From Swiss-Prot:
Name used for this protein in its record: S-adenosylmethionine:tRNA ribosyltransferase-isomerase
Biological function: Transfers and isomerizes the ribose moiety from AdoMet to the 7-aminomethyl group of 7-deazaguanine (preQ1-tRNA) to give epoxyqueuosine (oQ-tRNA).
Organism field: Ectopseudomonas mendocina (strain ymp) (Pseudomonas mendocina)
Assembly with partners or alone: Monomer.
EC number: 2.4.99.17
Highest taxon of the lineage: Bacteria
GO biological process, one term: queuosine biosynthetic process
């Protein structure tokens, strides 16, 4: 399959650069995978699509204010984007600077703080901070907005680029399908008899990296840490036993569950995943999906195409553009039921 098969034209005006006033105010495009039928509505219509006995699986990762500004001891300016917290004082990070810092060099952090460049690991730099890193980031860090939101972060992003159920710090990008849920909607979902469970996948900056090969089979995914607990495994088993559906909120929840079920049986899992889901790959756990609209030629669009079918997905995206849906992290959402006969692009 060619990466170019997953291209679509998107007007700049449809890229959402700010969140709506209310989380639940987004629109919802419903795609019935088996038939390809589309239905336009509001995000709160999701409640009508859920059934008593269903299980919704959310990603409870918490976005850290991972972007830092500072300067080298020589005075040169630089920007640090933390990719992964290794321990209380060490991180792996991307560093943007006219000249890369050398091992042993000091970095002075804007707002107060200091780090030492310890080593380079391919494109990432290992930094050691003088003080505990998570409190430092909370104090002087900036929210790591995606590159297509071309504006400085503001105070509102600290709340809105974060799900209301975020718990475990470590992501440098939000699991954006979850941004549409507020406490009231979650309560209404539970009141309907829908169960909830939480996985953790710390979303990395690699989620925004373009696919740089022509054939998608040649692409290698970035690695991210995730955890699927025994509690989640038991919740899925109970859902199956009562005839319910597993509804994943976001592609990160899909990747978590399907990683933990690569042997066809869902088992507890804790560790790194580089799972790449594209058309032709079977799904072992997820029956329905809540997801935002993704970038052209992105691995996430390929995942959705694997779930709903290539032709059905691309038709839905064309309809979304025609109807003026808002795209990407702060944009609108889709609710998709899995197409068991999903096919990739025609060769």
């Amino acid at each position: 399959m060619r990466v170019a098969d997953f291209h679509f034209d998107l007007p700049e005006s449809l890229i959402a650069r700010h969140p709506l006033a209310e989380r639940r105010a987004s629109r919802l495009l419903q795609l019935d995978g088996p038939s390809g039928a589309l239905r336009h509505g509001q995000f709160t219509d999701l409640l009508e699509q859920l059934r008593p006995g269903d299980l919704m699986v959310f990603n409870n990762t918490r976005v850290i204010p991972a972007r830092l500004f500072g300067q080298k001891a020589s005075g040169g300016r630089l920007e640090v984007l933390v990719e992964r917290v290794l321990d209380q004082h060490r991180v792996l990070a991307h560093v943007r600077s006219s000249k890369s810092p050398k091992p042993g060099s000091q970095i002075l952090i804007e707002g107060g703080g200091e780090a030492e460049m310890v080593a380079r690991h391919d494109a990432l730099f290992e930094l050691r901070f003088a003080e505990p890193v998570l409190p430092l980031l909370e104090r002087v860090g900036h929210m790591p907005l995606p590159p297509y939101i071309d504006r400085p972060d503001d105070e509102a992003d600290r709340e809105r680029y974060q799900t209301v159920y975020a718990e475990k710090a470590g992501a440098v990008a939000a699991p954006t399908a979850g941004l549409h849920f507020d406490d009231e909607l979650l309560a209404a979902i539970r009141a309907k008899g829908v169960e909830t469970a939480f996985v953790t996948l710390h979303v990395g900056a690699g989620t925004f990296q373009p696919v740089r090969v022509e054939r998608i089979e040649d692409h290698h995914m970035h690695s991210e840490w995730l955890e699927v607990s025994q509690e989640v495994v038991d919740a899925v088993a109970a859902c199956r036993a009562r005839g319910g559906r597993v509804v994943a909120v976001g592609t990160t929840s899909v990747r978590s569950l399907e990683t933990a079920a690569q042997s066809s049986e869902l088992k507890p899992f804790s560790g790194d995943t580089d799972i790449f889901i594209y058309p032709g790959r079977p799904f072992h756990v997820v029956d329905a999906l809540v997801t935002n609209f993704h970038l052209p030629e992105s691995t996430l669009l390929m995942l959705v195409s694997a779930f709903a079918g290539y032709a059905e997905t691309m038709a839905a995206y064309r309809a979304a553009v025609e109807q003026g849906y808002r795209f990407f992290s702060y944009g609108d959402a889709m609710f998709i039921t899995r197409n068991p006969a999903a096919r990739g692009p025609e060769v």
